[in-house]
Amino acid sequence: MNDDRSHSSLLVPPSSHDWIQGVLGAKVVLVMYGDYQDSKSANGYKLIKVIKQELSASFGEDYLCFIFRHFPQTQVHPHAQRAAQAAVAAAAQGQFWLMNDTLFDHQQNLENGYLVEYANDLGLDIPKFLKDLPKQVHIDRINQDVAGGIQSGVTATPALFINNIRYIGCWRITELMAAIVAASH
């Protein structure tokens, strides 16, 4: 999906500071830079969810760790930054992954009113969510993800790193699963 090959390795290693599914000590650690308004990011994320489920069933929960990092491309996706802020504000209430899924599922509707509706649907404290949404600390967190992506050569989304090495293959289940399994050996 993304042919930028200027860097082949992840220069900001995974850490407990990231949004993590799984354990950092897993055999395979995937880091995806994504944009909530980008259909390719949504498709890539959904593909990774399917692969993670299949590999966890086959090899156990500790086999694969998935990390999502924000990379809103505001020049082409005007609502991507605010959607990322909504995800981080939801994270402040322990609901990052549910909001992440919701934003990707509804990426055509990311205006402010919808973001509040999604937060309400997830049972978030709406006054707190609205207060947290514009907080500079959340914006700084997103900017850190973007800066790390840029350092690692990311210019477009989605961008995927498998065990810190840039994945440049096809975003199809067979190819991606083969690359993940190969990285575990």
Predicted regions and their residues:
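A structure-centric signal for secondary-structure junctions around beta-strands
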Residues: 25-27, 63, 83, 156-157
